[in-house]
A protein has these predicted regions:
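Right-handed parallel beta-helix/beta-solenoid
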Residues: 18-44
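Bacterial Sec-dependent N-terminal signal peptides
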Residues: 1-24
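Glycine-rich, low-complexity intrinsically disordered segments
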Residues: 28, 53-56, 129
Length: 133
């Protein structure tokens, strides 16, 4: 009976450890707009990446149009964002310089109209189109 209890306890501890580290590995994360992958948005996949990773992480983005304003912060590095097809995998956003800022009603200006802002090091984009539409 004690052996069974010990075995069951060890098994449960292993499950909890694996659940806590689901995204903490060098594997590929998958993004798909149609819900057939772990994530529907690229930003959600970026959010689960660890700060100051020493390993390479790939975020594979399936074909589709992703209307997102992405920021890859300075504490993220070694990330490759790879599209399924460069002509059919699109990150887009529609800011422009004349949009009024909340609170002061001044124009946004061009420096705030990015679609993707990369502050981290060793960030690679492959086989994907980024546009500011």
């Amino acid at each position: 009976m004690n052996k069974l209890f010990l075995l069951l306890t060890a098994f449960m501890a292993t499950l909890q450890l694996n659940a806590a580290n689901k995204y903490d590995n060098p594997d590929t994360l998958f993004v798909s707009r149609d819900g057939t992958a772990e994530f529907r948005n690229i930003d959600d996949a970026i959010e689960v990446c660890r700060a100051f990773m020493e390993y390479h992480k790939v975020i594979f983005v399936k074909k589709g149009v992703y209307k997102e304003k992405l920021v890859i912060p300075s504490w993220l590095n070694n990330i490759e964002i790879c599209g399924e097809d460069r002509d059919q995998t699109l990150i887009t956003y529609d800011d422009h310089a004349n949009i009024k800022l909340a609170g002061n009603n001044k124009p946004m200006g061009t420096f705030r109209t990015y679609t993707v802002k990369i502050e981290g090091n060793d960030i690679i984009f492959k086989n994907i189109t980024v546009e500011n539409n």
